[in-house]
């Protein structure tokens, strides 16, 4: 397996991740759309201002995520642990990138840009899984 090649393929094909947080030993997970900046190894996602997960980020910025496969029955995925923080970029700064990844996202951005805050996930390693027997940890 060419793990890095598979990492980039999966991270670019998938539209959503399951983002896991934990506060006071109480785990929480939610589905978010994302855009991955390959040049800087940063994953961006946007959420509405005032959502519960934002307060969780301030209390504990350690996160984990897994990509959600696009095809039913497919188990391939990218998993990683990292840190989340508020981005200096706005949703309008990343409008083109998000829109290229998810065509209907441009309408959401245009309607709700003032209500959306961008966050970024930074991570240095990921586990690339093709199936239950084929997986590999990579450094980025």
Where are these regions (language model features)?
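Extreme N-terminal tail/first-helix region
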Residues: 1-17
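Short, surface-exposed beta-strand-loop junctions and turns on beta-sheet-rich folds
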Residues: 51-53, 72, 134-136
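Charged, gly/pro-rich active-site loop segments
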Residues: 76-140
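Short acidic (Asp/Glu) patches
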Residues: 48-51, 60-67, 95-108
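A short, aromatic/hydrophobic, helix- or strand-capping loop or linear motif
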Residues: 22-23, 67-69, 107-114
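Short linear motifs in intrinsically disordered
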Residues: 6-10, 54, 117
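Short beta-strand segments
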Residues: 14-49, 57, 63-67, 76-80
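Short secondary-structure boundary/capping segments
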Residues: 9, 35, 108-111
């Amino acid at each position: 397996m060419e793990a890095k090649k598979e990492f980039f393929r999966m991270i670019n094909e998938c539209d959503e991740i399951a983002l896991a947080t934990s506060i006071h030993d109480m785990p929480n997970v939610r589905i978010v759309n994302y855009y991955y900046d390959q040049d800087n190894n940063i994953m961006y996602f946007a959420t509405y201002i005032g959502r519960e997960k934002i307060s969780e980020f301030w209390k504990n910025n350690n996160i984990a995520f897994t990509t959600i496969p696009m095809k039913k029955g497919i188990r391939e995925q990218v998993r990683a642990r990292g840190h989340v923080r508020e981005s200096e970029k706005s949703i309008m700064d990343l409008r083109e990138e998000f829109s290229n990844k998810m065509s209907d996202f441009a309408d959401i951005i245009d309607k709700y840009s003032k209500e959306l805050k961008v966050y970024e996930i930074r991570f240095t390693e990921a586990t690339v899984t093709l199936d239950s027997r084929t997986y590999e940890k990579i450094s980025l």
